[in-house]
A protein has these predicted regions:
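Short intrinsically disordered terminal tails
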Residues: 1-5, 59-62
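Basic/aromatic-rich interaction segments and small domains that mediate binding to polyanionic partners
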Residues: 6-57
Length: 62
């Protein structure tokens, strides 16, 4: 993704050998490029997890 997705957007991010759905909770531009903080809830867990991804690894969910 060349631009930063809006906060609150539903996205898919790489996770293990596949991808998981999540929600954008913050974005920023760092010295390492554009970054996206995504909240995901993994299968079997009821606690959300946040992780940071490079913007080019994030896809808007359909």
């Amino acid at each position: 993704m060349s631009t930063l997705p809006p906060i609150g957007s539903r996205v898919r991010v790489p996770w293990g050998l596949g991808t998981v759905a999540g929600e954008v909770i913050d974005t920023y531009d760092s010295g390492f490029g554009k970054q996206v903080i995504v909240m995901v809830i993994l299968e079997g867990s009821d606690q959300p997890l946040t992780a940071t991804f490079r913007a080019d690894a994030v896809e808007l969910a359909a």
